[in-house]
Amino acid sequence: SFWHGAKDRGDGAMIAYGAARYALARGDKEEARELWPLIEWCLEYCKRKLTSDGVVASNSDELENRFPAGDANLCTSTLYYDALRSAALLGREIGVSGKQLATYTAQAKALESAIESHFGYEIEGFHSYRYYEGNDILRSWICMPLVMGIYTRAQGTIDALFSPRLWTNDGLLTQAGTETFWDRSTLYALRGTIAAGEVEKGMDFLKKYSRRRLLGDHVPYAIEAWPEGNQRHLSAESGLYCRIYTEGLFGIRPIGLRNFEMTPRLPQEWNYMNLNKIRAFNSNFDIHVSRVGEKLHVEVLQEGKSIIKKNIEEGKTIKVRL
């Protein structure tokens, strides 16, 4: 059954993505074991929904048919893709069979190819994505592959997102040519743009968004939507705003219950950035990033004690074990 007749919005992919990432970042083995059957069930549900083109069928999306989403949309498939990757990492930590985890990894690889072949598209002159088969108008959710680390069409997608067709003073339009905006896609897009390495463009639009939302005439939080709900505040959007910094600028991706990858992106006009008192991976730690000539100096401190101190080239990824 589906909530209020909203049809299948891709909930299975949403839950698997969120629960797997949460369990990794939380760092609690017992909690991870408790969540595993839910994650496993949702992954199997999505697998059974795969079309002949290898993407996930769903007859709606999180906008619940306010805008067309076709029979299979980009959002659901990219969420399922990242869920498979996170589940393979999480399962290793809690004793799931290697065969099952290898299957998840193989399914993720196949899905990445299917996303490119089914959704990859020249749309309104941009080398980007169509949201569903038959879609020929730019949609804000073309940002989703960037958020999940798929950069095959990054440049064309970023150009499309910040073109006058989609970007307004209130962030991204849900669909080009309309007046409707939902902050969630703008917040995902800013995160994905910075994570993809387009730091200066991402920061420029992040500043514009922050001035408008956090310091403007409807403050102090990110909003849900307009015109629906008259820009009401919901907590989820504020959480997504924070993730622009943690996953975009600091490039943190959980890869275990005690470890993560980090690809810091220090904006040119900043000399340093610090993220202190991070409670994740069952630990308490700080991350300090500063510029040293052409390189970035990265230091991670756990309970005040330095555990990593190294210089890296911009755009490089380092692994941290707490």
Residue ranges and their predicted role:
Residues 1, 12, 33, 37-44, ...:
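Active-site core of glycosidic bond-cleaving carbohydrate-active enzymes
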Residues 21-22, 87:
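Alpha-helical transmembrane segments of multipass membrane proteins
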Residues 60-65:
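A short, charged helix-loop
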Residues 238-268, 276-277, 286, 319:
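Terminal, non-catalytic domain-edge segments
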Residues 97, 103-106, 110, 118, ...:
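Beta-rich accessory regions
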Residues 24, 44-47:
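HEAT/HEAT-like alpha-solenoid repeats
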Residues 2-6, 23-33, 66-71:
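The substrate-binding groove and active-site-proximal loops of carbohydrate-active enzymes
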